[in-house]
Structures are given as structure tokens and as C-alpha cells.
Amino acid sequence: MSKANVGINGFGRIGRLVLRAAVEKDTVQVVAVNDPFITIDYMVYLFKYDSTHGQFKGTVTYDGDFLIVQKDGKSSHKIKVFNSKDPAAIAWGSVKADFVVESTGVFTTKEKASAHLQGGAKKVIISAPSADAPMYVVGVNHEKYDASNDHVVSNASCTTNCLAPLAKVINDNFGIIEGLMTTVHAVTATQKTVDGPSGKLWRDGRGAGQNIIPASTGAAKAVGKVIPELNGKLTGMAFRVPTPDVSVVDLTVRLEKPASMDDIKKVVKAAADGPMKGILAYTEDQVVSTDFVSDPHSSIFDAGACISLNPNFVKLVSWYDNEYGYSNRVVDLIGYIATRG
């Protein structure tokens, strides 16, 4: 079967890393990128050099209005570059880009993201949570995808992609009565380098490099959409901390069935080695956040960091590269959708 042809709208952090993941995984073909704010020579520079993930281990050049991305042992990608502000005006069909990654962070509703369909795209994958598009987390509920009705879908958030696989394993084996999640989250582009005004909560606008900033996140509640039996049982919040990448979920839950920490470790390791291989990972090493930069997993369970008050009340810890792990799942979701027609 031929690879899915992919277009990327928005060549920011996630857009560029989706392209890196696509090159590395070699399971889809990127044929177009749209970004009205970046010239093609600047795209080459931004893709080649990355302060967090390092220099691209291949070559990137441009020829006219095409980016050429190549890496030894991988398929090369000849990528048409568009510069349209209006998603409906992007001629995705002209390069047979059937699948569009909507990674601007702007067009996150079904109505807004479906504008890509007017230009010839067949499916749109929003790389963010969506208020109304169905959310799919690879390894958790992606098999519920409905090819005949789901033309615009959401890959949920990076935090939901970390939390949901772990919550599924724990709920399937022991049952979750209720739980609270905290994510200690790396800075993102929405934050301010120094104190400035914020459109949401005032403290969101405080300097990202100077502060630990309490923040809201819908990631835990979103798990209830992905795993319906957990709906209303989880909520959470975030602390934004001054690190550039890699975040960590702390999931504190009450269990229906009592479980020792060894019991929990066994089922998580079995899932990581079995049905969730490549999505969920397991480590007993004395790891810290930088150990997971460019890790392609959604969720890496930290066995040594977990604690238990009693067999029904536990705190579980799982790491994630909030940029690269998530971008890998975007590519995986496209690959799965492509097999469903």
C-alpha cells in the first residue's frame, strides 16, 4: 500500500517536529507545508536547526517553491510550500495532500478546520484539543475512528496522550474511583519571556524563565472523552516550569481493587512490552527530564518515582516529550486513518 500524502498547516514547533517524525518513521509522505509568516529559506533554517532536539541529521534545501528533505536510509520528501492565511484557499488537492495536519493552534474547531476540505484535503487532524471534533489517542481509543463520519479529528493534547494510556492500564486492571492529575510542564510558545499581559489568567503572562506558574489544563477531563468510563472521575492542573521541553504527569488515584506497587508495575510493564509497545514505556532507572528529550513514546512510566499511601491510594509518575512524543502520535494517527480509507 502506498504511503499517505500529508500536508502541514503551520510550520511552528509541532509542524516542524511532525515533519521530523514523518522522516524518521518513514510511514507517511509529506507533500506540502503552508505557512503565511515564514519564507521558504527561513523554513530551511528553522527545520535544520533546533535548540531543543538538535540539528536535523539529514539535508534540507529548497528548489523554487519546494522544500527538499532527505536523510540516509529514509524516503526523501519533496514538499510544496504554500503561503496562504486562509485555510480554504490552500490547494492541497494540487499535490494530492489527502491528510492535513492543522498545527497553527488557530483552527481547532470542526467548522474552522474543515476549511481545508475545500482545498482538496480528505481528512484533517488537529494537533490540539478541540471543543467539538472527536478526539483520538493512539493506543487508547484510535480504533473507534469512524471513517465515514470523521473527516476532522483531534489528536488531543500532549498531556492527554501521556495520561490516557496510563489511566487505561490502571483502570482496566484495578478500576479508578477518582483521581487528580498534575502535570509539571515545560514552557511553550504561548508563554512570555518576560512579564507581560495575558489574555487569560493574569499569572499566565509572567516571565516563563523566572517562575513556576500554576496553570489550567483540560487534559485530565479530556481523558473522560477518550475513555468514557472515566468521564467525571479525573480532573487536573498544571505547573509551567522553566525548562524548554519534557514534562511529567503525576496521577494520584483511588483504586477500586487494592494493589501493591509491585502489582501496578507488573501490569504497566506488561502493557509497555505488549499491546502499548511504542506508546507506553517503562523504566526503573534514576531518570530526569532531559533523559527524555526526543523520546518518541507518549508516556514513560517512572517506576522508581511512584509512591503508595495504602493499596487503594497511589501516586503514579509518567514522563513525556511534550513536543516530539506528541508529534510521533500525529504521524501514527494519520497512518492508522489511512488504512481505514
Swiss-Prot record:
<feature type="binding site">
    <location>
        <begin position="157"/>
        <end position="159"/>
    </location>
    <ligand>
        <name>D-glyceraldehyde 3-phosphate</name>
    </ligand>
</feature>
<feature type="binding site">
    <location>
        <position position="85"/>
    </location>
    <ligand>
        <name>NAD(+)</name>
    </ligand>
</feature>
<comment type="similarity">
    <text>Belongs to the glyceraldehyde-3-phosphate dehydrogenase family.</text>
</comment>
<feature type="site" description="Activates thiol group during catalysis">
    <location>
        <position position="185"/>
    </location>
</feature>
<dbReference type="InterPro" id="IPR020828">
    <property type="entry name" value="GlycerAld_3-P_DH_NAD(P)-bd"/>
</dbReference>
<keyword id="KW-0520">NAD</keyword>
<dbReference type="GO" id="GO:0006096">
    <property type="term" value="P:glycolytic process"/>
</dbReference>
<protein>
    <recommendedName>
        <fullName>Glyceraldehyde-3-phosphate dehydrogenase 1</fullName>
        <ecNumber>1.2.1.12</ecNumber>
    </recommendedName>
</protein>
<feature type="binding site">
    <location>
        <position position="188"/>
    </location>
    <ligand>
        <name>D-glyceraldehyde 3-phosphate</name>
    </ligand>
</feature>
<dbReference type="InterPro" id="IPR020829">
    <property type="entry name" value="GlycerAld_3-P_DH_cat"/>
</dbReference>
<feature type="binding site">
    <location>
        <position position="240"/>
    </location>
    <ligand>
        <name>D-glyceraldehyde 3-phosphate</name>
    </ligand>
</feature>
<feature type="binding site">
    <location>
        <begin position="13"/>
        <end position="14"/>
    </location>
    <ligand>
        <name>NAD(+)</name>
    </ligand>
</feature>
<comment type="subunit">
    <text>Homotetramer.</text>
</comment>
<comment type="pathway">
    <text>Carbohydrate degradation; glycolysis; pyruvate from D-glyceraldehyde 3-phosphate: step 1/5.</text>
</comment>
<dbReference type="Pfam" id="PF02800">
    <property type="entry name" value="Gp_dh_C"/>
</dbReference>
<dbReference type="InterPro" id="IPR006424">
    <property type="entry name" value="Glyceraldehyde-3-P_DH_1"/>
</dbReference>
<feature type="binding site">
    <location>
        <position position="322"/>
    </location>
    <ligand>
        <name>NAD(+)</name>
    </ligand>
</feature>
<dbReference type="GO" id="GO:0005829">
    <property type="term" value="C:cytosol"/>
</dbReference>
<feature type="binding site">
    <location>
        <begin position="217"/>
        <end position="218"/>
    </location>
    <ligand>
        <name>D-glyceraldehyde 3-phosphate</name>
    </ligand>
</feature>
<dbReference type="InterPro" id="IPR036291">
    <property type="entry name" value="NAD(P)-bd_dom_sf"/>
</dbReference>
<feature type="active site" description="Nucleophile">
    <location>
        <position position="158"/>
    </location>
</feature>
<dbReference type="InterPro" id="IPR020830">
    <property type="entry name" value="GlycerAld_3-P_DH_AS"/>
</dbReference>
<keyword id="KW-0324">Glycolysis</keyword>
<dbReference type="GO" id="GO:0006006">
    <property type="term" value="P:glucose metabolic process"/>
</dbReference>
<keyword id="KW-0560">Oxidoreductase</keyword>
<dbReference type="InterPro" id="IPR020831">
    <property type="entry name" value="GlycerAld/Erythrose_P_DH"/>
</dbReference>
<dbReference type="GO" id="GO:0004365">
    <property type="term" value="F:glyceraldehyde-3-phosphate dehydrogenase (NAD+) (phosphorylating) activity"/>
</dbReference>
<dbReference type="GO" id="GO:0051287">
    <property type="term" value="F:NAD binding"/>
</dbReference>
<dbReference type="Pfam" id="PF00044">
    <property type="entry name" value="Gp_dh_N"/>
</dbReference>
<feature type="binding site">
    <location>
        <position position="35"/>
    </location>
    <ligand>
        <name>NAD(+)</name>
    </ligand>
</feature>
<keyword id="KW-0963">Cytoplasm</keyword>
<dbReference type="GO" id="GO:0050661">
    <property type="term" value="F:NADP binding"/>
</dbReference>
